[in-house]
Amino acid sequence: MNKSNRIQTAELDWESIDGIEVPISKQFGDVYFSKDNGLLETRHVFLNGNDLSERLANLQDFEYFSVGETGFGTGLNILALWQLWQQVRPNNHSHLHAISVEKFPLSKADLIRALNVWDELRPLSKQLIEQYPFPLAGCHRLSFPEERFSIDLWLGDAQDIFPSMVKTKAVNAWFLDGFAPSCNPDMWEQNVLNNIVRLSDYGTTFASFSVAGILKRGLKAHGVDITRPRGFGHKREMLKAVWKAPVSEEILLEPVRDTFQFTQQRIAVIGAGIAGLSTAWAFAQRGHQVTLFERTVPLSGASGNPLALLNPKLCPIEQSHEHLMTLSWQHALNFYKNFQAFRPIQIQQMALKNAQDLLDLADQYPADIVTQQTSSLESDYPHILLTEAGAVSPHQLRDEILQHPGIELKIANITTLISFENKVQLKSGNETTLEADHVVVCCARESAALFENYPLLKPIRGQVSWVDNSFATLPLNEAYSYGGYCMQLNTSELILGASFYPNRDDQEVLLDDHVHNFELIHSVFPHYAKQLPPVEQWQGRASVRAQSPDYFPLVGKMQNESRISTFAGLGSKGFLFAPLCSEVLVAQILGEACPVPKSLLQKLDAQRFQKKVKPKKPYFKSQ
């Protein structure tokens, strides 16, 4: 993505026509939807133009259908698609996914105003607005599991975004929208159309209000068969097309990795920390049968602290489209909001070193999510405020996830994986415990016991402390980050963390670590720290994090054709990374759209250190 291409929200004029407010783009000098009836035009051009009523109504059980769009705009096309899905979707586990790109997203206030026109869409508009993303570049996944519907909204320039998309699943239908070619020629350039076709397959359909020569030539160059039926209203023609040509050699250079069959899958997840819990949840939400194995009790490792803080480290704004921590930030917030275990908070990030660099970095972000504000605690250090953050109660989250009817917890020590062509056998000692279609190993450093040449994960000891502070409590919706962190664990206790000792795996609670945590807070908030009880009265928990050599988690299959995957090495950011990374993992296994760009997927690749990681003998067999 071009460094100059920071996300700017759309600049709008508004025109009132027959009592209806129509937004007009100042950047492109064109309307966002028809002045006659934008919703009827969407149905005529995009829904009927792709024959979606019939196609969606006939989806098989567990079938995954994706629709791509070249300009999100007000979201009207996607909302009309969602409404149609509600009307015709079969009573099974099929899923509809939309992929849309937008260079100039509307502000949330403008989006609310634009969609207020459509009374019949209001229930859907409300749900969309609740998850509408920050104006930060990259992919933002909006999930509506009860609707069996999801949206990947990619913010940025289409010329950069479409080449960056991973083709794990071919797009079934396209809405070629995004202002007229005369107003927005960049959207219709050959590079964009080449990548739209790259992301498609035999039988993919296309529809557009435009029949401009640049569009027709671009599609015909790839063998797309075009017709021009009557357009909407006063428009004489529209474009309707289907790709009937054989797949070209260029397209075959990036094969679809979808080997998924439209049946319920039996999934085994080994390890019940946050990686395993989020993975189990992602599969179960799609209707698959999940068995979650844990050797002792869930959250017995580093995920089992009393509280988890969602505290992203900001990156330069031009890197946000491929920065794991930034992309995980809003995804995690949207994920945890579904649970009672989540507490929305604000985080004061203190600038202990290079203060001006942090302040300059904050200025690159939208002021409604990153700003500067006076701290509730007295300190000599400057700071920034993250207005959108959160804290999670891990044990409450565990209990909520394990209540899912599609997840079964089993206490067992899985010692052997035997992989066959169409299944994986799990053994505990000499006893076969389960046969599964896919296995995901989420055991942190212990994952290596099930593989040969598993990447080395560094142990990092960490201890959190908590102490009575009923005499001087902090606001429940505030946290402070300063190399360590502190916030209210509950209404009468303060939690502080965390010590950080690489290459140590001891887990005894130590007074020295309490002292370390005290010294961290005292160095930044000395007046407050002096009020805390002596460290001898503090309680704590020590655990060992697992960190990969390059600080990125291991996410994906251990061999290209294997039914065995891993998800491990999350370090100290497990609760931040897990929701997004589990979606990446599920996309690879089930053949769904990938919510991160190619560049980031390569950094997460579980095979990146050794491309030939093999299960220990005799774990891998063919039959």
From Swiss-Prot:
One of the GO BP terms on file: tRNA wobble base modification
Report the transmembrane regions from the record: none
Task: Quote the EC number.
Answer: 2.1.1.61, 1.5.-.-
> Catalysed reaction per UniProt?
5-aminomethyl-2-thiouridine(34) in tRNA + S-adenosyl-L-methionine = 5-methylaminomethyl-2-thiouridine(34) in tRNA + S-adenosyl-L-homocysteine + H(+)
tRNA processing listed as a keyword: yes
**Cofactor(s) essential for the protein:** FAD
Chief subcellular location equals cytoplasm
This entry carries the following GO cellular component terms, namely:
cytoplasm
Q: Coiled coil: which residue ranges?
A: none
Q: Which UniProt keywords apply?
A: Cytoplasm, FAD, Flavoprotein, Methyltransferase, Multifunctional enzyme, Oxidoreductase, S-adenosyl-L-methionine, Transferase, tRNA processing
For region FAD-dependent cmnm(5)s(2)U34 oxidoreductase, the annotated ranges are 270-623
Q: Which family does it belong to?
A: In the N-terminal section; belongs to the methyltransferase superfamily. tRNA (mnm(5)s(2)U34)-methyltransferase family.
PANTHER family reported for this sequence: SARCOSINE DEHYDROGENASE-RELATED (PTHR13847), TRNA 5-METHYLAMINOMETHYL-2-THIOURIDINE BIOSYNTHESIS BIFUNCTIONAL PROTEIN MNMC (PTHR13847:SF283)
Q: What does this protein do?
A: Catalyzes the last two steps in the biosynthesis of 5-methylaminomethyl-2-thiouridine (mnm(5)s(2)U) at the wobble position (U34) in tRNA. Catalyzes the FAD-dependent demodification of cmnm(5)s(2)U34 to nm(5)s(2)U34, followed by the transfer of a methyl group from S-adenosyl-L-methionine to nm(5)s(2)U34, to form mnm(5)s(2)U34.
Q: What NCBIfam families does its record include?
A: MnmC_Cterm, tRNA_MNMC2
- Quote the protein name from its UniProt record: tRNA 5-methylaminomethyl-2-thiouridine biosynthesis bifunctional protein MnmC
Q: Which source organism?
A: Acinetobacter baumannii (strain ACICU)
Higher taxonomy: Bacteria, Pseudomonadati, Pseudomonadota, Gammaproteobacteria, Moraxellales
